[in-house]
């Protein structure tokens, strides 16, 4: 695997921007790390100097959600680890978190090793991995424990959609969340009501709707919002931190915001697409263009969605930005030319993310430069526990840096992007703010518009469990949440008998008291108790009335059942 030799760099005159402060200072980089920050630095002679006067020095962007190797119908995405990370660096992103998705019959551990092998040989920037859980069975528990203990993974994703492929039941999700909490990891959810989506898909196909518009029509906003609410409910019951991937609609974003205000430990991830474009393109007369927008949950056709999501991102109700970058060529998308359910899902956004967020949030006056750093790198590094190695400009942090020109403008176009696909879903969008220099592992990889990347130079960044940013609140709540039963005397009043429905195949009805309650005969012999753990009694063979009248003296007998 190629290993790049780090440059020794002096960055002069820039404005250093972190999530909590901005200040003017020079910065010296050596051995891939930030070694000095300040004025009048004493540095070796003959080193490369970068003039950053009038520019900002930011932590390199962290894209929390990519799918550069996601298999769909046997096809792999057009932008693999090499091309995808090259595009990331071109846009100012210096680290990605990719999703491992195991094929049928492949274990989580084996899939993780496949992803590591592909990324280690091809990634141009540092990376880490989330692991998706498409199927839940007993051995999954041991696999999650091994991934956390030995492989540096601290985040797992479950699906509430894709029925009959990887959709989990609510009970399974509760079980998985409880395990993830005990392991100190972060539970991620793809939130859509898969049952409703499947029924809507059938209905639309029966009506003869086969084009990309069928995709958005079969995934209405409500099925995303409902699933987010359900995921929040389950996570709250399990006291597990929750991370909602791909927040695409106002309804879903509002659910996250409301839960956050109720004190639920929940994080929401809007993506480049939901912040920078809208779903009106699903009705384009150009099938290939419309198909390029197909992803789940879909990009919302409501043109006010992006403005709403950027407002929630600016207020802190949503905390991070990803891209969900997973691109397919027009020929690959055309597998679903006669059936929208077969169009491979995936869109671009890895290269455009930083500029789109700056344009929509900072240039529009919704957030300042510090909040921009928080939502593009720092919060992600804190949630997934690689802060301050990444996401901060500080002595000792990795030298993953972006020299940012807030005044530069560019128009996004498929003609000039660094992707292997014919369409760009942000075609024609003009962005203020773009990187002029990008530094990865202390080495200049973008300068004067020239990309100088090294496939395989990216390192895997292992992550520890129990990130403070996420788990301090969870731990405190665990201590406060111990449940104790109410001490009571023994209930010795009457118990109504009920007829339980017959078990399949038995042909007879079973008579029993309500489960867990003790049934007593009219006269109780304390020395010959008929109580058994099964709920049956010693005199069950004697025919009795199904109810009996209890005679009691005026005012009631003094026992546990009296109201006094």
UniProtKB/Swiss-Prot annotation:
Keyword Phosphoprotein: yes
Subcellular location(s) per record: Cytoplasm
GO molecular function terms noted in the UniProt entry: filamin binding; hydrolase activity, acting on carbon-nitrogen (but not peptide) bonds, in cyclic amides; phosphoprotein binding
Entry GO CC: cytosol
Phosphoserine: residues carrying this PTM: 529, 536
Cited function: Necessary for signaling by class 3 semaphorins and subsequent remodeling of the cytoskeleton. Plays a role in axon guidance, neuronal growth cone collapse and cell migration.
Name used for this protein in its record: Dihydropyrimidinase-related protein 4
Organism from which the protein derives: Rattus norvegicus (Rat)
């Amino acid at each position: 695997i190629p290993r790049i030799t780090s440059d020794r760099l002096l960055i002069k005159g820039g404005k250093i921007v972190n999530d909590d402060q901005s200040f003017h200072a020079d910065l010296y980089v050596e051995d891939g790390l930030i070694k000095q920050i300040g004025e009048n630095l004493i540095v070796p002679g003959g080193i490369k100097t970068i003039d950053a006067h009038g520019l900002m020095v930011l932590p390199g962007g962290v894209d929390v959600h990519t799918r550069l190797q996601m298999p769909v119908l046997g096809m792999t995405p057009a932008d693999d680890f090499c091309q995808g990370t090259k595009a990331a660096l071109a846009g100012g992103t210096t680290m990605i978190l990719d999703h491992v998705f195991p094929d049928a019959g492949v274990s989580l551990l084996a899939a993780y090793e496949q992803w590591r092998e592909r990324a280690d040989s091809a990634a141009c920037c540092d990376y880490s991995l989330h692991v998706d859980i498409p199927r839940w069975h007993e051995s999954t528990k041991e696999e999650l424990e091994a991934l956390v203990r030995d492989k540096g993974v601290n985040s797992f994703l479950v699906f509430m959609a894709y029925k009959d492929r990887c959709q989990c039941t609510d009970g399974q999700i509760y079980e998985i969340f409880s395990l993830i909490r005990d392991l100190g990891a972060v539970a991620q959810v793809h939130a859509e009501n898969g049952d409703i989506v499947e029924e809507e898909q059938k209905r639309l196909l029966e009506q003869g709707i086969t084009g990309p518009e069928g995709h958005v029509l079969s995934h209405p906003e409500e099925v995303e919002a409902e699933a987010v609410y359900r995921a929040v409910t389950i996570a709250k019951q399990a006291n597990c931190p929750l991370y909602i991937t791909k927040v695409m609609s106002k309804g879903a974003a509002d659910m996250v915001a409301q839960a956050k205000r109720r004190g639920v430990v929940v994080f929401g991830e809007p993506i480049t697409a939901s912040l920078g474009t809208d779903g009106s393109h699903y009705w384009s007369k150009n099938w290939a263009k419309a198909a390029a927008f197909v992803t789940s949950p879909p990009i919302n056709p409501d043109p006010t969605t992006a403005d709403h999501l950027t407002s929630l991102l600016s207020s802190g109700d949503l905390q991070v930005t990803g891209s969900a970058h997973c691109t397919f060529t027009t020929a690959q998308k055309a597998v679903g030319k006669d059936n929208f359910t077969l169009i491979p899902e995936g869109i671009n956004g890895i290269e455009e993310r930083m500029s789109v967020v700056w344009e929509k949030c900072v240039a529009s006056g919704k957030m300042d430069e510090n909040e921009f750093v928080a939502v593009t790198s720092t919060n992600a590094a804190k949630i997934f526990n690689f802060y301050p190695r990444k996401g901060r400009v500080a002595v000792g942090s990795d030298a993953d840096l972006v020299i940012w020109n807030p005044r530069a403008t560019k128009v996004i176009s498929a003609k000039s992007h660094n992707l292997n696909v014919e369409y760009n879903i942000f075609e024609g969008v003009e962005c203020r703010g773009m990187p002029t220099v990008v530094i990865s592992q202390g080495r200049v990889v973008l300068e004067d518009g020239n990309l100088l990347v090294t496939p395989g130079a990216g390192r895997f960044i292992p992550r520890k469990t129990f990130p403070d940013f996420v788990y301090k609140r969870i731990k405190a709540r665990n201590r406060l949440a111990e449940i104790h039963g109410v001490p009571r005397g023994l209930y010795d009043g009457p118990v109504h008998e009920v007829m339980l429905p017959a078990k399949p195949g038995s042909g007879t009805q079973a008579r029993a008291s309500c489960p867990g309650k003790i049934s007593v005969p009219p006269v109780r012999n304390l020395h010959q108790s008929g109580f058994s753990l099964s709920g049956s009694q010693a005199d069950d063979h004697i025919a009795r009335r199904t109810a009996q009248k209890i005679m009691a003296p005026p005012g009631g007998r003094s026992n546990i059942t009296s109201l006094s």
